[in-house]
From Swiss-Prot:
This protein's name: Phospho-N-acetylmuramoyl-pentapeptide-transferase
Keyword Metal-binding recorded: yes
MF GO annotations: metal ion binding; phospho-N-acetylmuramoyl-pentapeptide-transferase activity; UDP-N-acetylmuramoyl-L-alanyl-D-glutamyl-meso-2,6-diaminopimelyl-D-alanyl-D-alanine:undecaprenyl-phosphate transferase activity
Gene: mraY
Principal place of residence: membrane
Amino acid sequence: MILATKVFFTSFVFGFILFPYFIKLLKKISKDGQPIRSCGPESHLITKKNVPPMGGIIILTSSLLPILLWVQLTPEILLLILITLFFALLGFIDDYLKLKTNHYRGLSAKTKILIQFIVALVGVFILKLYSAECFTKTSLFKGVIIDFGYLYVPFAAFVIVGSSNAVNLTDGLDGLAATQVITSFAFLGLIAYITQADMNITLFCIAFIGAILSFLWFNTHPAKIFMGDVGSLSVGAALGLTSVLIKREMLFAVIGIIFVIETLSVIIQISYFKYTKFKYGEGKRVFLMAPMHHHFEKKGWSENVIVMKFWIISIICSVFTITFLL
């Protein structure tokens, strides 16, 4: 408990101190802030203007400091750190290109996903090298075990990449991604503790909770900084790999239900638009706008209302998971 407290407060305090200086630095470097989509909600062109991205740099710095200081660097923790940093580098390049071109598009989606899958597959193969014979097995719920066999490697890679991009899609409102990530880390860390999977993984989760809470202080509406792709892609990958390491990938889908809904809303919207355009010559939409949080914005909901209601949903689903499915 004392060690967990050290990890939490080290990451939180370190982030809380660094963020104000980092925000000032970013505003000097990029006066225009993160490029905003002109096709997005009209209010964002005003409320998101001149807000700098790349807050994920401080999130990672604040998280990794206590991990390196207080957490035992087991192969699992080292793998978590490496995968997180690789995805952070990809996100940093994406953010940099957006700022350089002053356009909301950075790396192409195909390029990002290809690199993500390569990194994830390499990470899972490394995990396989030092894992036990039960490597291909995962827990569904209440002791129900599924053996994926040879399919587990691509499945685990899909979880990591899917989680990374789901957090990225969710990061569209002030405080939305941060609150969802905090909940996911909290309950995945709790599962690791309850199941005695690995106390070091619990400490890893606690470090990120502290760092993201310090970020949330400056990211609540109206946000002073965004986490950027360097934050969302890396944090999402860390969540996905954490669920893989504790063998609770399926439960993570329930805990991170908002991530799932946000991702599905985009897939449904794009698929239906392409289908109707092909069949009728004119594309139609299921939602007013995707991801889902923009749909509710279009219906007149305020950012704070959407963020809080989505957070309530994720907490309820997480408590349900711990109570009835674990």
